[in-house]
Amino acid sequence: MRLFIIRHGDPDYAHDSLTEKGLREAEALAEWFADVRLDEIFASPLGRAQMTAAPTAAWKGMEVKILPFTAESMDYMASFSAQDDIGYTYSVKGGVSDYRDGSGRFEERSATLAEMIKGSDEFLAGYGMERRGGIYRAFGTCEKRVAVFCHGGFGAA
């Protein structure tokens, strides 16, 4: 399996869309993917990820399938410490303030992360991958090439 994880183009967070720059980035990415084999295209349910995926899907004549578990979580912006399955400890004090929306309403971290992990595990299992500790390993052969258009808040969480 070859997995392309793509963060959306330059965002207009207030309208859950892309700026003019973000639209140009999405078009440039579609041109880059023109000569790259893709078997499936997925995106978060949020507009900015779907708008980034749309030009690539149009160039390829493909459908964009929605993956709800890839929606952006703002949990990573709250202060936390966590230890992963392979022994690393991460501490973030005050989160990443650049993206705060001012609402102060952050999800309960463990529940959101559990949903993302479960969704990721189920998704990747469909392509012959299995989580063992903090690492995914192949338990079968899969030649698929898959693009997932999502968010920094998905990858950071």
Residue ranges and their predicted role:
Residues 48-50, 73, 155-156:
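Short, active-site-adjacent cap segments at secondary-structure transitions
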Residues 124-157:
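Active-site-adjacent alpha-helix immediately C-terminal to a catalytic or transition-state-stabilizing loop
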Residues 61-133:
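Phosphate-handling substructures
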